[in-house]
Amino acid sequence: MPVSDAILTQILAQLDAMQVSQQTIQAKLDSLTGATTPLEPKPRSVSVSSEPSTPPDTQVGIVKASLVSAALRVEVPTPRTTAAAEKEREKLLYPGRVNLTTYPDQFGINPYPLKWGAGDPKTRGPVICSRLPSSIKQRNAIGAHSGSYSIYRALSIAMGSLSPTHKPDYSQTEPPVSIPPQASWADPTKIVSFDPYGHLVPTIYHKEIEEGLDIRPSIAVTKAHMKMSELDDAVRKGEIVVDGKVVLKSRPLRNVDGSESSAFSGVEVNISKAAVEPVWYLPGVAERFGISESLLRRALFEDTGGMYPELITRPDIKVFLPPIGNLTVYIFGNPAFMSDESKELTLRVHDECNGSDVFGSDICTCKPYLTYAIEECIRGAQKGGVGVVVYFRKEGRALGEVTKYLVYNLRKRGGDSADKYFKSTELIAGVKDMRFQALMPDVLHWLGIKKIDNMVSMSDMKYDAIVKSGIPILRRYDLPDHLIPPDSRVEIDAKIAAGYFSSGKQITEADLVKTVGRTWEETEH
């Protein structure tokens, strides 16, 4: 009976994986014992007695002593032998020649079919970006999983800490709450910035994974408790109530002596959350930004230092995993209510600000707005609705933290008036904002959101992007004045004058000159 090509391919893939695994083990061994070139046989300097009269415990002691003695006699490697060993180790990890890029008509290249926007995940096909021997010929995506963290994976493999052929065990990782398929998942224009099936990969493509294809989840869904000191304060003030369902009492605190404290232990919030990695469908991303796909590919290639040549040489591959930060969805209340239009939905779309969100900087309103939105989401969930906070990793308006701090320096040395707020950023970055909210609504369509009752945001860009995507917003409201730190008045006034929503007094360009932030001299002690 003839053996089918599929079986032969599977056997070959398994042999390739075994070879790489064996090479990795050998590389680890060489790194531990490599005082000499790995090609040289190591002299046996340890002799272990095996006399029948020697008890087992004694034999173990002899072995340990002999190994310690041998370790002390190991010669210090010279730069030449170390370099040779490292070179040999590199060959063991990567035995083939370096493949800088591939081409559509190259021999053996056969990408796994991928039809973006297909209603059935099997018809759509898995996203495969792996360069492992078992998957490289069937790659249908450019880039690597984990975004910017893919660099740490590469370091871990190079140092021998991680086997490149490690096969994850997904048996207990399925989502504890359901994010079910929506009609938008089958619309190639609604979701173009991540894989809507990313959290279902281990289930949908179990057979393909077992056959050797390196297919990985790009979304993870879990449940957790959220604990913030600001929420404790809100409970003390009576602004949030402990209902035992959404808001729970924290366990009692402990005194220094270990006894139970009678002090207020605070509260915690019952939430569901999802981490979503970027997976770009290039034709859809290009269309969303109003540019050609070829221009998008060229810009991504050139302005990442030429990191991804296949953006140019593989026009047949339409999916790209960019090395950028992910987003996180925080859900307050029943996740099933997100797609139920009869339920009231409160939303905050928040772009990362590490200085304020985590470390409490008062130069901007980011943390107060985030905290206020979380409280609003909790109140909405307790009234029978659902709250959603989407946290995007777009530090410093996607300009980065270094650029942001340089702008801070310019602002403080220049008087820090609101009329110069955006100009200060443009002088350094060349643009006032690079967040480009066109891709942001994708996650709302993934969650099944069809209307937003309460939008806790003043951003005109976020509002316009969401409404343009087909989701109506019934109410928007701004941050209450009493929550705005004095030094962040510069930011908020400049944004209102530039078009941000405000239910209060409108601010003119003439008013901006009068809004001035704190100077450095005022903070010196």
List PLM regions with ranges.
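Catalytic domains of riboflavin
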Residues: 2-5, 12-14, 30, 42-525
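Long, heptad-repeat coiled-coil alpha-helices used as oligomerization/scaffolding rods
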Residues: 4, 22-25
